[in-house]
Amino acid sequence: MQARQRRRAMEARMRIAMLSNREREVLDRLTQGCSNKVIARDLDISPRTVEIHRGNMMEKLGARHAAEAVRLQLEASLVDWLH
């Protein structure tokens, strides 16, 4: 079971590595439960720009919902924990 989890975590990390820095910042804040409005304020960008980054991020990750993107982020963080 742990080998399978490690593989999934590595796959998630590889997918997240394809994101731009700004897309990763948006994903980090989504993972923290922030709304687009809060993300926009924190990053000093417009809510529309957050939507664009979020859409690009989800397309690159192959995520249909924000929850899938957050799950990938959490799985990617398991790599260090599983070693």
What does each model-found stretch correspond to?
Residues 1-18, 25, 75-80:
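Short, flexible helix-to-coil linker/hinge segments that flank and couple to helix-turn-helix
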Residues 4, 39-42, 82-83:
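Short, hydrophobic secondary-structure boundary micro-motifs
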Residues 10-49:
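Helix-turn-helix DNA-binding segment
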Residues 42, 53-56:
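Residues within the DNA-recognition helix of helix-turn-helix
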Residues 55-83:
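Basic, Lys/Arg-enriched C-terminal extension of HTH/homeodomain DNA-binding domains
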